[in-house]
A protein has these predicted regions:
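Single conserved hydrophobic/aromatic residue that forms the stacking wall/gate
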Residues: 174-184
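Flexible glycine-/small-residue-enriched beta->alpha junction loops
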Residues: 104-157
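Conserved functional loop/turn residues at catalytic and ligand-binding sites
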Residues: 42, 52, 92, 107, ...
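Short glycine/serine/threonine-rich phosphate/pyrophosphate-binding segments
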Residues: 14-15, 63, 93-97, 118-123
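Conserved active-site "lid/cap" helical segment
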Residues: 1-56, 60-62, 66-70, 74, ...
Length: 184
C-alpha cells in the first residue's frame, strides 16, 4: 500500500525564550494545530490508527508521552493511541517514516504525524544533562550536534553548502503557508 501526506499544518515561528509562544505550553499549541488539521480533513477521528509525534527533549511540559496527550487534548476519542519518539533533530521526520512503514506493512491506514518542541519551555539538552563519563572521554561524538550531523551527511552524499542553501530556499518558497493561529 502506498503512503501519501494529505495535509499539513505548522505553528508560527517565534523567538526562543522571548517570543510570542514562550509562555505557551507545548502540549497546548500542539493540540491546537491538530484541531485545525482535523477540522480541515473529512475523516472520522475514530479512523486514526495512531498519533506519532517526534520530540527531541520529551521532558517537562512536553514529556509524559506528548503524542498521546495532544491526541486527547484535540478531542480524539480516549481510545486513540499516541506515541512520542526521539531521534533528536530528526524526530518529526522519523515519525513520518514510522507511519509510512506501518501503512506499507498493513498495520494501519490513517496516521497523524508531527513534531513538537518548545525551546523556551525546555532548555537545550534538557533539564538534567548528564552525559555518561565513558562517552565524554572515549567517544564524545556520541553527543554530536545537528550542525556536525549536517556536515557529516553533506560529506557522505557530496552535497555542497550552496546546494543545501538552495534546497532550503526552494522548500521555504514552496511551503509558505499561513501558520495555525494559536490562542495564547
Amino acid at each position: 500500500m502506498s503512503s501519501v501526506i494529505v495535509d499539513w499544518r505548522r505553528t508560527p515561528f517565534s523567538r526562543s525564550h522571548k517570543g510570542e509562544l514562550s509562555e505557551v505550553r507545548p502540549d497546548e499549541f500542539a493540540s491546537q494545530v491538530l484541531v485545525e488539521l482535523l477540522n480541515n480533513l473529512n475523516i472520522d477521528p475514530a479512523e486514526i490508527d495512531d498519533v506519532i509525534v517526534g520530540c527531541a527533549y520529551p521532558e517537562g511540559e512536553q514529556g509524559y508521552n506528548i503524542g498521546r496527550l495532544m491526541a486527547l487534548m484535540s478531542g480524539l476519542p480516549k481510545e486513540a493511541p499516541g506515541v512520542t519518539i526521539n531521534r533528536l533533530c530528526g524526530s518529526s521526520m522519523q515519525a513520518i517514516m514510522y507511519a509510512s512503514a506501518n501503512i506499507s506493512a498493513g498495520w494501519g491506514e490513517c496516521f497523524v504525524c508531527g513534531g513538537i518542541e518548545s525551546m523556551s519551555r525546555v532548555k537545550r539538552r534538557g533539564f538534567n544533562w548528564s552525559p555518561h563519563p565513558k562517552f565524554e572521554t572515549d567517544f564524545p561524538e556520541a553527543y554530536v550536534n545537528m550542525g556536525i550531523t549536517a556536515e557529516n551527511v553533506a560529506e557522505l552524499y557530496g552535497i555542497s553548502r550552496t546546494e543545501q542553501e538552495e534546497f532550503s530556499l526552494i522548500l521555504s518558497l514552496i511551503h509558505i503557508s499561513e501558520p495555525t493561529r494559536l490562542a495564547t
